[in-house]
């Protein structure tokens, strides 16, 4: 092995003091293999255990924090207390070989699939029509009410509590890839005229809610990460200038890492 790669195998300490055995991370893999109700299936466990063997952190597939947020079939759920037992099995499998196990907490927003959403009621920061996972025709999303936005924020906090109860070492907040948090940051998706027109207000509120749950139910060792997409093709969309401002805001919060997803 070339010497320039050797640092990848060195231990690294996160801002919260947790030590990782190396610098390799298994990014979340969309496997569409959870049970229809979002509970963890027997197929998932050996799949994720095998892939978690030699990394420092392993992150489970995007897990919906609310039934009004499911973006693809076979998506794991962290929306209900009844999900916790299956999530315990998942966390155990992910940690079996020494990796820190995180669950990615997620809300699809406009990318929700109507057939997987209660009453087919897809919500987004502003009204929009688009194609999502596997769709040949567009579906429409309506604008979220203030109450629905506040509930979505609380849902991320409750998902964090469930992750803690299930034995995960942390959560990754999914703020990338055109899903709900990304949509609030993007001027393409967020055309509101109220307080939520501030594109940084929603992601910051979600992080604050997650950190509040961490403080209430866990300790400083619980890892909190944030995933973002720095640019998008849509116009007007997220630019590097917008992302720089977002990073300036969230990097001053007690999170442990930022995960960049180039989509």
PLM region descriptions:
Residues 1-263:
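Flavin-dependent oxidoreductase catalytic cores
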């Amino acid at each position: 092995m070339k010497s320039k790669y050797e640092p990848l195998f060195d231990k690294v300490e996160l801002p919260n003091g947790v030590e990782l055995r190396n610098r390799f991370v298994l990014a979340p893999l969309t496997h569409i293999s959870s049970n229809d109700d979002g509970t963890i299936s027997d197929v998932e466990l050996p799949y994720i255990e095998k892939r978690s063997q030699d990394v420092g952190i392993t992150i489970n597939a995007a897990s919906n924090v609310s039934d009004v947020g499911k973006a693809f079939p076979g998506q794991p759920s962290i929306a209900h207390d009844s999900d916790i037992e299956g999530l315990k099995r998942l966390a155990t499998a992910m940690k079996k070989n020494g990796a820190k196990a995180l669950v990615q907490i997620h809300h699809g927003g406009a990318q929700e699939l109507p057939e997987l959403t209660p009453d087919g009621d897809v919500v987004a920061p502003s009204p929009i029509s688009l194609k999502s996972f596997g769709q040949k025709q567009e579906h429409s999303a309506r604008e979220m009410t203030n109450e629905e936005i506040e509930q979505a924020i609380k849902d991320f906090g409750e998902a964090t509590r469930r992750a803690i109860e299930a034995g995960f070492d942390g959560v990754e907040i999914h703020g990338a890839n055109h899903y709900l948090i990304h949509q609030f940051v993007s001027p393409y998706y967020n055309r509101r005229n109220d307080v939520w027109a501030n594109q940084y207000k929603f992601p910051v509120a979600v992080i604050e809610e997650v950190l509040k749950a961490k403080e209430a139910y866990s300790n400083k060792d619980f890892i909190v990460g944030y995933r973002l997409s720095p640019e998008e093709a849509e116009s007007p969309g997220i630019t590097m200038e917008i992302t720089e401002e977002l990073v300036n805001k969230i990097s001053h919060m007690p999170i442990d890492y930022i995960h960049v997803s180039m989509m």
